[in-house]
């Protein structure tokens, strides 16, 4: 049963699914679509051609689908699509896109914490966590299963690869390769996101191949392109390694981040099920 509080404003034309809850003083504009089981909490504001996926909760004072903060925007018809079972927390802002027919998209099962900002033409994958005050400029692409710590600023057109973990208070100016962990301003790669991969049940052999890939690409002294080719020869049967190489070879407006934290440990993982430390 849908429950809309009398003080909420839901404009004619808005599409409201089954079992939707809209709390006091929330505002839902005419072109919005709320799928089944969505909860819109008090004072939230949802505008534009915005679709909120099933089971997602929009927390108080979040703003979604409003005009992009981009001087190039001329009133074109653009879209926001938020997936299923997301949590968009207090005061988060997700603006609409720029240029006719384009979309700001967020995948399923994402947690967007308070005061995060996702700008025009961004795309965010599934199972992503943005901590408080994460700020994405326009055209940023974030892969699946990425975690970004508090107060991180991301330059426009940057790509952040799947399973990456970005430490708090970092400044991101270049593309972050998938499966990596790092921090800092300027940013420095610390190695492979070993703990994150283990939590996601990535097999031990895959994690080991990724660690050896990281060492070869960033610490061997080989040229960047030569090292990408050599890891494909040695570990090309591992899908995650192929994905890493493909990401690094894709066209990029910002370039790949290659700064390294030389003090970071690149020891191979210890896996309780696999036994003791594995030497390289």
UniProtKB/Swiss-Prot annotation:
It catalyses: a (3R)-hydroxyacyl-[ACP] + UDP-N-acetyl-alpha-D-glucosamine = a UDP-3-O-[(3R)-3-hydroxyacyl]-N-acetyl-alpha-D-glucosamine + holo-[ACP]. One of its GO terms (biological process) is lipid A biosynthetic process. It comes from the Bacteria. Pathway: Glycolipid biosynthesis; lipid IV(A) biosynthesis; lipid IV(A) from (3R)-3-hydroxytetradecanoyl-[acyl-carrier-protein] and UDP-N-acetyl-alpha-D-glucosamine: step 1/6. PROSITE patterns: HEXAPEP_TRANSFERASES. Its EC number is 2.3.1.129. The keyword Transferase applies. It is found in: Cytoplasm. InterPro entries: Acetyltransf_C, Acetyltransf_C_sf, Hexapep, Hexapep_transf_CS, Lipid_A_LpxA, Trimer_LpxA-like_sf. One of its GO terms (cellular component) is membrane. One of its GO terms (molecular function) is acyl-[acyl-carrier-protein]-UDP-N-acetylglucosamine O-acyltransferase activity. Gene3D superfamilies: Hexapeptide repeat proteins (2.160.10.10), Udp N-acetylglucosamine O-acyltransferase, C-terminal domain (1.20.1180.10). Keywords: Acyltransferase, Cytoplasm, Lipid A biosynthesis, Lipid biosynthesis, Lipid metabolism, Repeat, Transferase. It is an enzyme of class 2 (transferase). Involved in the biosynthesis of lipid A, a phosphorylated glycolipid that anchors the lipopolysaccharide to the outer membrane of the cell. Homotrimer. Belongs to the transferase hexapeptide repeat family. LpxA subfamily. This is Acyl-[acyl-carrier-protein]--UDP-N-acetylglucosamine O-acyltransferase. The lineage of its organism: Bacteria, Pseudomonadati, Chlamydiota, Chlamydiia, Chlamydiales.
């Amino acid at each position: 049963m849908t429950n809309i509080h009398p003080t909420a404003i839901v404009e004619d034309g808005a599409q409201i699914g089954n079992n939707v809850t809209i709390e006091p003083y929330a505002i839902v504009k005419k072109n919005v679509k709320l799928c089944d089981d969505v909860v819109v909490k008090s004072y939230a504001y949802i505008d534009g051609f915005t679709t909120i996926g099933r089971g997602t909760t929009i927390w108080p004072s979040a703003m979604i689908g409003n005009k992009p903060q981009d001087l190039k925007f001329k009133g074109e018809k653009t879209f926001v699509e938020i997936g299923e079972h997301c949590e968009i927390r207090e005061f988060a802002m997700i603006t609409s896109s720029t240029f006719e027919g384009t979309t700001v998209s967020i995948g399923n099962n994402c947690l967007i914490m308070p005061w995060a900002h996702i700008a025009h033409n961004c795309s965010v994958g599934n199972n992503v966590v943005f901590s408080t005050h994460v700020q994405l400029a326009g055209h940023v692409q974030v892969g699946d299963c990425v975690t970004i710590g508090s107060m991180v600023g991301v330059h426009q057109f940057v790509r952040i690869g799947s399973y990456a973990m970005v430490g708090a208070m970092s400044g991101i100016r270049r593309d972050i390769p998938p499966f990596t962990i790092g921090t800092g301003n300027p940013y420095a790669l610390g190695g492979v996101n070993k703990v994150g991969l283990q939590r996601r049940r990535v097999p031990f052999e895959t994690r080991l191949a990724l660690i050896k890939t990281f060492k070869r690409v960033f610490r061997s002294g080989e040229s960047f392109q030569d090292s990408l080719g050599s890891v494909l020869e040695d570990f090309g049967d591992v899908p995650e390694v192929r994905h890493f190489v493909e990401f690094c070879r894709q066209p990029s407006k910002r370039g790949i981040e290659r700064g390294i934290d030389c003090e970071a440990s690149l020891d191979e993982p210890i896996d309780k099920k696999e036994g003791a430390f594995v030497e390289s």
